[in-house]
Amino acid sequence: MPNLLIQGGQPLNGTIRPHGNKNAALPTLCASLLTDELVVLDNIPHITDVEKLVSYFKDMGSKVYWDKGAKRIELSHRDFGKAGNAALPVGMRSSVLLFAPLLHRIGQVPLAVNAKGCALGVRELDPHIEIMHHFGAEMIQSASAIDLKIAKPMQGCRHWADYMSVTATENFVMAAVLAKGNSILLNAASEPHVQDVCRFLVQLGAKISGIGTSRIEIEGVDSLSSGAFQISSDFHEVVTFLALGAMTDGHVEVHDVQTEHFDLIIRSFAKLGVSVENDGETLSVFPGQTRVIQKPLTSNILPKIEAAPWPYFPVDLLPLMIALSVRAQGEVQFWNKVYENGFSWIPELTKFGAHVVTSDPHRIVVFGNRPLRPATVEAPYIIRAAVALYMVAATIEGESRVIHADPIRRAHPGFVENLQRLGAVVHWD
């Protein structure tokens, strides 16, 4: 696997335009299967999971034109299924987002039971299968596979989810837009990428209300039309570059930001002593940040950042703020309320000299501003943890290495090139 070789200690300065959000691009590509008409998607990131979906579409007979330089994909699925019966893409959790589209198009979904995307912990299939069952699908299970089949058009339903699952919400929406009658989902996820998928489907003629809330109501339609849609910018990249600017005492401006999603994120930066300036569609950090962790008015508790489903602080951003806190003065608790394996990479972070105490599988305390040293660390199969390890290394004078850093490419095209434009000394080894 590729490694990152880092010469740290340089301040990062410059402007950045983030790529499209991976977590919006993948379900939107899957949702394009719900129409036979031409679909044009802009701001599509060039990442491995998109490559896998495009290959799958082509293997199944779809016509796909991908202009990688322009970040545009044009899709026509009119002949989908006529070229054979290709296996679902492997090694990507997003394969579950093909459940509803495939049941609508060909009436069945063959699925290996070990679909996964990263090492964050148990990522169960049950919520997705339960939703498809509510819409009329039947499950046939063997030791190594699960087949979902449906013999008649989907019927609208009401479902109260156990928890706010992003992909389960997206699967429900994709099933409901072409189901007969009305459907209601309670305890729906509302992340910006979920909103993107819903707005894309509305662009094609779907009738969805409650977008961005925990209650989504959908009136099924007979068919969807053609349409064009632009994927929103990746707020994970936005936070990464802002934090790197603050950590290295640099000046970084990030453009094309949907700043309406950043109120809580900006306040979380402030908890770590970093001021983020908001200028419409641009967020900036400047040199001279205090990086002193704010103490709460209640003096006997630690300052903390809690991560949970939106509109809480996004759990995928937690590693990036942990990296920033290592370079801040004071103590802060991080609480991951979603993944039981979300802090498995912390022992690698401590190889740099970071002082982190693991309280339990969901909580850690970072004691910031300790002396750090260059190190060779191993990234887990967790995208943002690999990024966070790079971020800390970038602040330390001398040569560090992040081995097995390839998961970064699953979400961040041109990651190294963007860093180099900001003045970082880093390359793939």
Kindly give the residue locations of the regions a language model identified.
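Short, structured segments at the rim of ligand-binding sites
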Residues: 1-429
